[in-house]
């Protein structure tokens, strides 16, 4: 009598194969979802950091320079033209001290001229377009010409707009003090935060310090409790985005600094 072959090969049923395939598919989908989520979070984090860092650096630079201002900040439009009221506005301009204090005397060789000097052996020479402030004579005027009196000199003859240097008359052996200021500005235009280093001598020259700015009118003068402009402060609202990762739907990552009220240093000048 022949016995049956008990060692014959066995296989999976169709139902078992389908269940195993489904399990593998579910695991693969879960792993893909986790990896994709991680990549999205990484991309978003990088985008946020880039946008935040650029806007933060821009605001810190604006705040630093406003802290150095010696004139009441003035609101301007994107073409650096003055605007009325408390804003908001695209830009702001103000004066900072760039050199001085200097002694001011009438030139001994030409009394009709004035001479500014310092005991500093290596002073920074004022430049045409800088603003000269002589508080004792209420003189605030732009420098139109400057000549050094000798090579390596630490004193110069200075000529002011409208002949204002002729208003300064000092007695022999006496002097008055002057400061040299420069009007600078920050303007948002075409999504760029632009820095203007000298609005008198080179009004069209600027450098871009932040990009992708989404707040076109970030500057204003805050109101005090009575509802009038508080000119002691400048309010800055700056926001930015980084569109690099827009394909992952994180284009609108941004930073917004609302009402960062920045006080200026002092009011040395009476005029803008």
Pin down the residues of each PLM region.
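Aliphatic-rich helix starts adjacent to a transmembrane/signal segment
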Residues: 10-67, 271
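N-terminal leader/signal peptides at the extreme start of proteins
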Residues: 1-12
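Short linear sequence signals and composition-biased patches located at protein termini or domain-edge surfaces
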Residues: 50, 98, 180-183, 190-272
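Acidic surface patches and DE-rich sequence motifs
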Residues: 8, 74-76, 224
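N-terminal pilin/flagellin-like segments and related low-complexity appendage regions
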Residues: 46, 55-211, 215, 271-272
């Amino acid at each position: 009598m022949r016995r049956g072959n008990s060692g014959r090969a066995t296989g999976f049923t169709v139902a078992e194969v389908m269940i195993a395939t489904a399990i593998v598919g579910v695991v693969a989908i879960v792993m893909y979802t986790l990896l994709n989520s991680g990549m999205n979070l990484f991309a978003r984090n990088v985008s946020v950091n880039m946008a935040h860092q650029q806007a933060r650096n821009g605001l810190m630079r604006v705040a630093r320079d406003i802290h150095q201002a010696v004139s009441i900040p003035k609101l301007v439009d994107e073409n650096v033209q003055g605007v009325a009221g408390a804003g908001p506005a695209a830009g702001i301009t103000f004066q900072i001290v760039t050199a001085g204090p200097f002694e001011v005397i009438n030139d001994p060789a030409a009394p009709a001229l004035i001479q500014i000097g310092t005991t500093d052996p290596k002073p920074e020479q004022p430049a045409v377009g800088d603003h000269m402030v002589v508080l004792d004579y209420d003189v605030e005027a732009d420098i139109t010409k400057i000549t050094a009196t000798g090579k390596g000199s630490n004193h110069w003859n200075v000529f002011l707009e409208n002949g204002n240097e002729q208003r300064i008359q000092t007695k022999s052996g006496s002097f008055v003090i002057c400061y040299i200021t420069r009007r600078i500005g920050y303007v948002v235009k075409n999504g760029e935060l632009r820095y203007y280093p000298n609005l008198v001598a080179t009004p069209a020259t600027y450098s871009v310090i932040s990009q992708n700015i989404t707040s076109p009118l970030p500057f204003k003068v805050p109101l005090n409790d009575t509802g009038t402009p508080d000119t002691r402060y400048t309010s800055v609202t700056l926001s930015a985005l980084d569109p690099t990762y827009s394909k992952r739907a994180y284009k609108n990552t941004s930073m917004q600094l609302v009402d960062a009220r920045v006080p200026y240093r002092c009011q040395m000048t009476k005029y803008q």
